[in-house]
Amino acid sequence: MQLTFNDFIKMEEIDHQYFPDENVSPADEAYKWYLADPNSCVVVKDNSNVVAYVNILSLKEEVYNKVKFNEMNESQILVSDLELNKDKYFNYLYFSTIAIDENHRDIHTLRQLIDITSKKIIEIVNQGCEIKEVMADCSTPQGQKITQRFLKLKPFMKTSHNSMIHILSGDEFIELLHK
């Protein structure tokens, strides 16, 4: 499914339902991520409107570590921070946003989003990409619940912007996806 800039405007609106402005990636930058790497965004639509989405960023190792150790947050990530080199693609995977429109927050939408996301990641791994580590930065209790319950990522550290970094080894994550 091809996404448009208007889809990213809607995603930014969804973000503002939950996250403080300083933690929201601007639609124009998120759209650049998508244009550089179409695998970076998975959406659920209802009547052609985005109602839920996940940003899955393949980050350069040094950028990944800056996010992991609270030296940088999602809203500062630029398209130049993405790892697009085929030999290193998806080594350091960052779930930068998992968000569902407040009018569509139900288990069906969540399961659909997780299912589509899992299939996308498995498809990429089956093309020969090696995931070394997976990370999510959770700003809400709901995000922490999704990250821990469905993605099985483990709490790593609290950030200066009131969120919690969660991580999991790539091997553990791949094993989980195949269950």
Residue map of PLM features:
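Alpha-helical elements of Rossmann-like donor-binding domains used by nucleotide-donor carbohydrate transfer enzymes
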Residues: 10-14, 29, 112, 116, ...
